[in-house]
Amino acid sequence: MLNVREVQKLKASNKRLWSLSWNHKGSVLISSGEDRVIKLWAKCNDQLWGSSFSLPEAHKKSIRCVTWSPCGTYIASASFDGTVTIWKISEAHSAPEMEALVSLEGHTSEVKCVAWCPSGHLIATCGRDKSVWLWEFDDEEDVQCVSVLQPHSQDVKSVAWHPHGEVLVSTSYDNKINVYREELDDWTVFAQLSGHDSTVWKAEFSPSGDILASCSDDLCVKLWSWEGVCGKSSSWMCIATLSGYHTRTIFDLNWSPDSQLLASCGSDNRLCIYKMPANGLTHIGGKPCFEEPPVLWGHVPNAHSEDVNCVRWKPGNITDISHSESISNCHLFLTTASDDGYIKFWSIEYEL
């Protein structure tokens, strides 16, 4: 079993925290929430993290999602005010500065999520208006809408990209997961995944790109894969269901950088960590499957005092994570954010 240990706790807000995102180097964390503030967090010394920059009133209403661009130069923030703002980060005068480049307008209600594609040239947004928007972000920092989709019958909760190609997924209150690709210069749904019995809050591809994980109001985490090539003619199927570990809605999940561990969190205040089989995904009769089932490898029953809304693994390898005394034996490192206004930093220790 893992040893999951809290190593730091930061009071980030007096209101709900909803979103966290690490830059690609794992050197800066951003947070956002109900207070409309975007905060950047960096190492104060070898052991502790602290606030390095704070931008109050970044939006007119709550900021539901913040995320770094793949290059680490830009941040996108999605708000209940119906807009998404693209910010440019600079290190002028030895301190971070944020410049608002453009506001993406078009959604007619709350924007719930924003996600950059791996190349950084496409941005996906989704919201309460049941729509998914695709935006092109070019080298001159110009943004234009390239597609508007309304494939769901209810609010769209999240969007996420495949790590190796321009394939997009969205999740919704309609209990469905839609998978999109570009065909003839337009984006279309080429697969719809049914299996959850209630709202699907989040779906995310593993960094290896061969598994899609989803979590739901039905208290289940499901793992999906496909025959053929993702984005081409492929038949999708659920290859595992992880249930019985959360007692209330599962809000978020996130893969570890090596695709071996999956973390989930929810309104039961819990943090759960699952281990994938050591021999990974295999194929029997041409169909993807596990020879052994994924297992719950560790959990924290009361990770926070209130709902845990977000969990994010820190990018990086063992060397750049394990140099400080406080986490000297840590192989991996993750963060959580909660309705209680705290960000928590956790070390994950286990035998290789």
From Swiss-Prot:
Keyword Repeat set for record: yes
CDD domains the record matches: WD40
Entry keyword set: Repeat, WD repeat
Residue ranges of WD repeats: 12-51, 58-97, 106-145, 151-190, 195-234, 245-284, 303-352
Alphabetical list of Gene3D superfamilies matching this protein: YVTN repeat-like/Quinoprotein amine dehydrogenase
Pfam families: WD40
Matching SMART domains: WD40
GO cellular component: cytosolic [4Fe-4S] assembly targeting complex
SUPFAM superfamilies: WD40 repeat-like
Purpose of the protein: Essential component of the cytosolic iron-sulfur (Fe/S) protein assembly machinery. Required for the maturation of extramitochondrial Fe/S proteins.
Family assignment from sequence similarity: Belongs to the WD repeat CIA1 family.
Name used for this protein in its record: Probable cytosolic iron-sulfur protein assembly protein CIAO1 homolog
Species this protein is from: Schistosoma japonicum (Blood fluke)
Upper classification of the organism: Eukaryota, Metazoa, Spiralia, Lophotrochozoa, Platyhelminthes
